[in-house]
């Protein structure tokens, strides 16, 4: 069974960090089956310098080092059994509009919507710095991005979200159940 968690933003990264610490104690166990063999984690954050995202990556790397060392040990151990795979969705930000204003300038209807929903200050916030407590600013960004995923796949461009979807599809093709959790504000 594939188990996946998609975490959005800095708060989502805090949830991923808690998942890493919970995995240390084998908190993800199925009754009668023991600890989950693996969790596949995807961090989605446009703020490349987000401290929360960096912290969870470091915690997951340290966890995997400890898990691998314990797995190689000939002794039984009561924790660190679940393999954690964490990746950050890069979203090819360099190929995207830098702000709501720039994105709206590309599409007339998006421009009308942006002028209606957002102040000029909000619309000029740079995506590379995150949404600064305004998750609604990401609506146009993510709508544009998700709409381009299949084009990216067709062009052979690597993408972490497409890769996760491919793993989910492979699980389903093998007749396995897929469970997806999400963490966001």
Question: Residue spans of the language-model regions?
Answer:
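Segments that form or flank anion-binding pockets
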Residues: 1-178
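Conserved small/polar residues in nucleotide/adenosyl-binding loops
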Residues: 183-185
């Amino acid at each position: 069974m594939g188990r996946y968690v998609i975490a959005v933003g800095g708060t989502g990264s805090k949830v991923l960090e808690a998942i890493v610490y919970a995995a240390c104690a084998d908190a993800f166990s199925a009754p009668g089956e023991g600890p989950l063999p693996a969790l596949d984690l995807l961090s989605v954050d446009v703020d490349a310098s987000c401290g929360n995202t960096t912290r969870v990556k470091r915690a997951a790397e340290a966890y995997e080092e400890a898990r691998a060392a314990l797995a190689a040990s000939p002794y039984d151990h009561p924790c660190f059994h679940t393999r954690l795979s964490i990746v950050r969705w890069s979203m090819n930000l360099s190929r995207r509009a830098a702000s709501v204003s720039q994105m709206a300038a590309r599409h007339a209807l998006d421009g009308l919507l942006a002028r209606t929903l957002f102040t000029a200050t909000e619309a000029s916030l740079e995506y590379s710095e995150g949404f600064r407590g305004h998750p609604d600013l990401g609506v146009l960004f993510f709508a544009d991005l998700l709409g381009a995923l299949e084009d990216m796949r067709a062009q052979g461009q690597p993408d972490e979200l497409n890769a996760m979807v491919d793993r989910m599809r492979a699980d389903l093709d093998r007749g396995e159940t897929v469970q997806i959790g999400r963490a966001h504000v």
